[in-house]
Amino acid sequence: MLFGSISHWKRQLAEGAATPAELVERLAAAMEKENPALNAYLSWNTEAALQQAAQADLTKPLGGIPIAVKDNICIAGSPTRCASRMLENFVSPYDATAIARLRAAGAIPFGRTNMDEFAMGSAGENSAFGPTRNPADTERVPGGSSSGSAAAVAGGIAIAALGSDTGGSIRQPASHCGIVGMKPTYGRVSRYGLVAFASSLDQIGPLTQNVEDAALVLNAICGHDAKDSTSSTQPAEDFTAQLGHDIKGARIGLPKEYLSLGNDAAVAAAVDRAVKTLTGLGAEVEEISLPHAEAVVASYYIIACAEASSNLSRFDGVRYGHRTGIPGGLDELYSRTRAEGFGDEVKRRVILGTYVLSSGFYDAYYARAQRVRALVARDFADAFGKVDFILGPTVPTPAPKLFDADLTPLQTYLADIYTIPANLAGLPGISVPCMQEGCLPTGVQLLAPHFKETALLSVAHALEQALR
């Protein structure tokens, strides 16, 4: 049971049916009751949220609305642990720009959501503080790495949440949990205050109960930021402006490669249902090709792990974070601190990243992966010369069982095969629920050219409304 959308609570607050403090208290009570079964939240501070609620300005776009926040986005005075022992006792001294903008819009950051450690994972199983569970079936994964954000929204213990998306970490758990998840164009949302995994791929975005709420959150957090050198100077927009518009004549491409990679029958049925629905709304759906689709996973993991190897080198026991208590020299300090502080998946990716950047292997792996990335971007440029949007599965299968012993690491990595391309090319993408009643949640993904979020949200909203 969902807690109620942003739009719903804005009306309730405006009409005096509830106060911001009452909303925080009701949400906190739901969190206390439901979180033990889901492990969606790592912590929350009800007292601090109530203090903010007492000063809420209901005339602001998100006035009095609590928003959950992934544990890798800095909130001043709040633990920012990245679900890792390495940062278990770290308290952020400042707000991320996205948080500052939420506050400026009147929202109340409330609750730190669980995640795969340092955003490395596709299942929500890699947290140092225990796995997150899927509200649809607590024996299954919620997806990752924004596992807690997705589970909190789907489980009725968050109105909306922020996550981060490096290779699908917003859209993939949104699909598995049956909610909306959106990755904006790279640079749309400032990365200042987001703990880096792979800097050329990371992007903050919303996980929400519906498309309208995603647009409302984007309105608050988007815009240029001088503190982020990769921040776009593209003017901010009203992302709700085209919601409810007719999409007749919209040209939508369906990549043939996305239909030939062994999708689960439920996923194939969801895509077919979306195609029929969009066609019924007057959109024109045609087959297209993305020739390098099968190379994206290898390219992504080489690039992302290389960047992670560099970004995570700062966690060495000297400046901040975990520091080993075992005496020894400087080399021992580094190695023991990192061995104790990082989990297995993080170690695996740091080792891989160091390897592909090392002498003799840079050209063989990293440089080739970057060339594939350029080819993927060119594939999309060619496709968007023919169509306005691209439709496909968000993930190849519904949510697997937690700690499924039959799944190999490679199969786990392949779960992101449809979401990774948007990160490599820097495109906006959104996952919209499209499941049959009685079945596990699954979603379909819509992609658009750079900075076409407003049009993308319009099509996603039309699809969402028609599917209801």
Task: For each feature predicted by the language model, list its residue ranges.
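An N-terminal boundary/leader segment
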Residues: M1-N45, G280-G282, Y355, R468
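Conserved hydrophobic/aromatic pocket- or pore-lining residues that grip, position, or stack substrates
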Residues: A49, K70, L102, G130, ...
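Short alpha-helical scaffolding segments that buttress acidic/His motifs in well-ordered protein cores
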Residues: L23-L27, S299-Y300, V346-T354
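Long amphipathic alpha-helix in the N-terminal Rossmann-like dinucleotide-binding domain
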Residues: E47-A54, G106-A107, D116
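Short glycine/serine-rich loop/turn segments
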Residues: L62-I204, E257, C305-A306, G392-L410
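Structural helix-boundary/capping segments
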Residues: A14, K33, G155-A160, T166-L261, ...
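Conserved acidic residues
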Residues: N39, I159, D388-I390
